[in-house]
Amino acid sequence: MNRRDFIKSAAASAACASAGIAIPANLSAASEAEKGWRWDKAACRFCGTGCGIMVATKEGKIVAVKGDPEAPVNRGLNCIKGYFNAKIMYGEDRITHPLLRVNEKGEFDKKGKFKQVSWKQAFDVMEAQFRKTYDELGPHGVGVLGSGQYTIPEGYTAAKMMKAGFRSNSIDPNARHCMASAVVGFIQVFGIDEPSGCFDDIELTDTIVAWGANMAEMHPILWARVSDRKLSNPDRVKVVNLSTYSTRTSNLADIEIIFAPSADLAIWNYIAREIVYNHPEMIDEEFVKKHCIFTTGPADIGYGLRPDIKYKKYLSSELDTAATEKSKVLSEAEGVTLSYLGLKAGDTMENKNTATAGNHWHISFEEFKKALAPYTLEFTAKVAKGDPNEDIEEFKGKLKALADLYIEKNRKVVSFWTMGFNQHQRGTWVNEQAYMVHFLLGKQALPGSGAFSLTGQPSACGTAREVGTFVHRLPADMVVNNPKHREISEKIWKLPAGTLNGIPGSHYVKMMRDLEDGKVKFIWVQVNNPWQNTANANHWIKAAREMDNFIVVSDPYPGISAKVADLILPTAMIYEKWGAYGNAERRTQHWRQQVLPVGEAMPDIWQMLEFSKRFKLKDVWGEKKLNDKVTLPSVLDAAKAMGYSEEDTLFDVLFANEEAKSYPANDPIMENFDNTEVFGDKRGVIGSDGKEFKGYGFFVHKYLWEEYRKFGLGHGHDLADFDTYHRVRGLRWPVVDGKETQWRFNTKFDPYAKKAAPNDKFAFYGNKAAALPSGDLKGVTDKEKTPLTNKAKIFFRPYMDPCEMPSSEYPFWLCTGRVLEHWHSGTMTMRVPELYRAVPEALCYMHEQDAAKLGVLQNEIVWIESRRGKVKARVDLKGRNKPPVGLVYVPWFDENVFINKVTLDSTCPISKETDYKKCAVKIYKA
C-alpha cells in the first residue's frame, strides 16, 4: 500500500468506524498499520499562527503527523510545512555529537577542523573561553543570540541564566529581526505589548487588509480562514492586498495596491487625511476624546547604521549610504512632508535625535490635522505608486477605494501586517500609523475590527517578548532599567538586592558590530542562524572567523552559523523535548516529549543548566566592571545573608533550589512519556562531567513554568498553571479565573479593562510612557508631564524616503523574504526531500521588461550586487511572485544564494529591527 492509498484508506476507515459501517479489507490494512501508534497533541514548529497538530509515535520514532481537529486555530488543517514536522528531525546530516575545531593533538584551535568530542571536553573548552572573555571584558563582553523559536521554558532559562546569573543583559533574540517594531509600536501606543484582538476577528469582520503581509504563503492557515470568510459573503466581504510586488495573497484580493518601498507611510497619512478633512463626521469623537491623545516625535532620527560614518572596516562603496546616519539631503517628496519643520527639498537635515528616536510628546488635534495636510490624493499617488506601468488615475482610484472601506460606517475592518511593516527603517512609525486610523474611526479592540500585528515565528510572542529575552527586558513587559522592575524580579528569583544589571546590553545587530569591534568576544547561538539571517553578512563572517572571538552554536544541523562556529553543540529538536509556544493571538500551548533525541543530542535547557554548574557565586556576583563609567557592586555579602554560600553554583541557586526540587519526578503528566532532563534516558549519554547523565530528579520544566507565571499574575499577563495547558488546546492570556481573553482593552471581554474602567466601554491600561510632556509639531513646549490614565496614543509620523534608493549605478530595489515551502534559513526544511524537490533553490523574481533590457532569459543565472556584496541566482520571470519594473525579490532560505551578503544592516532607529525589504542593487548576467 503506497502513501497516498494509505492516507485515503485511513480517512475512509475513520469515517466508516464513526458511522458504524463494516470496514472493507483494504481499509482494515490501514487500520492495522496504525496499531501500536500513540497519538498526542503538540504545536507546529513553524510560523506564528500556532496550529495544533497530532503526533503519532511507534517504537521510539515519529511515524505520522496530522492536523489536530480539536485545535481552534487550524481545525485539523495543516500547511505543507506542517505536515512535515516529523521529517525535519530526520535529515541525513543531523549533528549527533559535539564538534570542536581542534589541531592534530586534539586541542582547541580556531584554525583547526571540526572533530567529534565528548560533552565534557566541549564544556571544558566553552567554560575556559567564557571565563577568559568574562574576566577581560565583563558581563557585556559575552552574549547570547536567542530566538523566537525558543520554547517558553528555554527562553526563560536563558534569560535567567544571563541576567540573574552572569549579570549580563547581552541576550537578544532573532525576533529583533521580525517583531521589534511591532513591540515598540504596542508599547508606545498602548503602554503594553501584544495584540488587542484575536484570530476570531477573521470570521467576524467585513474587510481584511493585508499590509506588507503575504499571508497566503507566510500564514497559510490563517489565509484559509480569510478565504473561507471571503467566500461566505463575497459581495459584502472585501479583501485588499498592499505590497511592493504582486504575491499569491493578491489572488483573492478585490483590490491590489503595489506601492513604492516606504510609501506605506504616505498611504496611512492619506487615509487619515481623508477622515479628518473630508469625512470628519466619521471620527468617533467619543472614543477619541475619552480614550486617546494625539502625539508626535522627532523626524531627524537616522537609519540605525553605525554612528561612525567613516568606520574603518566599511568598504569604500558603503560610505555613501553610511553617511546618511549623520545627515541627509531632502528629496522633493520629503520637502513636502517635512515642511512642518521649516524644511524644504534640497535642505540637509542633520540627524540630531538618533539617540532619542523614541521620544514623543502630546500635541493638539489641530497640530495633528495640520501635519496631515500635504497627504492629498494627488501627492500620495505620486509618491506611492510602485508599478511604473500602472495608470496614475487607476492607482488613485484604488487609494480612494481603500480609504472608503476604512471609513464606511458600520463596516468592520481588520488590518493585518507582518515583515513589510516591521522590517522597515521606520517600522515603529508605520505600526503606530495603523492604530492611528483605527482609533480615529473607533475600530479597535472590537470583535471583527482592529489593527493586528501577526508574528512570524512560533513563539516570538510567547517567548521572546513575554519572557523577556531582549537586551532591555524582563518577564511580563518589565525592563532592566526600571529599579522597581529589577526589585520585583530579584524577589521572584530570590536574588540579593542589586544583583540585576540595570543597563541594557547590545541588541542583535549591535552585538554583531561589537563582535567586529572586539567589544564582544564570546557568543552562544541558540535556535537560530545569525550568520545567515543578519544583513550585511560579510562583515560578521569575517568577525567570527578572523578575530579572537569564540562562537558556540547549538544546532541540530550544519547551517552557515554552525560552519563559522568554533564549537557546535548537538541539540534536541522540538518533539525530542518538553516545551511550550505562544502564538500571535496570545495563545499558549504546551506539548510533551514524544521521542528521544538522536545520537548524543541534548535539549537546550540541559545545555544551559549544565553550563550553569560550572560557575560559582564568587565567580559572578562579585564586583564586575561593565564599562569605564559603571561597575556592578558585589552582592556576595547579601547573598550570604540570604543563606547562600559563595561556593554555591548558579545551578544550585537558580535552577535546583528548594522550590525547584518541590516539583516531583513522578508527576502524572509524565506517565508513559520520556523526559530526558528529569530522568536521563536509555541512550546513557555521557554528560558534561564525564559521567552518565541520569536526570535531575525533579520536574524542571514545571518548576520553570510555575516560577515564570508569577511575573504576570495580577499584571495583565496572567497565564494558567502548567497542568491546565496539558488538558486544553491552548489559552489566550490574560487567563483570569480560568477564562481566556479574546479582546483586550474592551471592558466586555477583558477583566483588566473592566477593573480599570468599570463604567466605560474601553480602558487602555498599559502603563509604559503613561505621562507625556506637551508641545507642537516641532518639539516640546511644556516639559511638565501629564498623566494618560487608560488612554492610548494617536501618533502623527511623516513620510520619509529610505536611506538607500536606486541610482544609475544600482538601479533596482531588492526585497527579501520567505516562500511557503521553506522556513527561515532552510536548515530544517531544505532537508525534507519533498520540500526540497518542490523548491530546491532561491530564485531572483524579476519583471520581464527588466529581463529583456538586461538580455536575460527565464532560468538564466545573474549576479545581484549591492554596495556590500554580491550573489548569483537563477532568474524567474513567470513564478508566484511578480515584481513591478525596477524591483526584484529574492528569498533567503538558500545558503547557496546567500542574499544577506547583499542586504543593508539599516534598522528602525527606535526598535533596532533590520530593514530587509529595501536596498539598491545592480543585476547583470553571470
UniProtKB/Swiss-Prot annotation:
Gene Ontology biological process: Mo-molybdopterin cofactor biosynthetic process; nitrate assimilation
Annotated SUPFAM superfamilies: ADC-like (SSF50692), Formate dehydrogenase/DMSO reductase, domains 1-3 (SSF53706)
Cofactors demanded by this protein: [4Fe-4S] cluster; Mo-bis(molybdopterin guanine dinucleotide)
Keywords linked to the UniProt accession: 4Fe-4S, Electron transport, Iron, Iron-sulfur, Metal-binding, Molybdenum, Nitrate assimilation, Oxidoreductase, Periplasm, Signal, Transport
Cofactor note (record): Binds 1 [4Fe-4S] cluster.
Subcellular localization, as worded in the UniProt entry: Periplasm
Signal peptide interval: 1-30
Function noted in UniProt: Catalytic subunit of the periplasmic nitrate reductase complex NapAB. Receives electrons from NapB and catalyzes the reduction of nitrate to nitrite.
Family per record: Belongs to the prokaryotic molybdopterin-containing oxidoreductase family. NasA/NapA/NarB subfamily.
UniProt protein name: Periplasmic nitrate reductase
Organism encoding this protein: Campylobacter curvus (strain 525.92)
Chain's gene name: napA
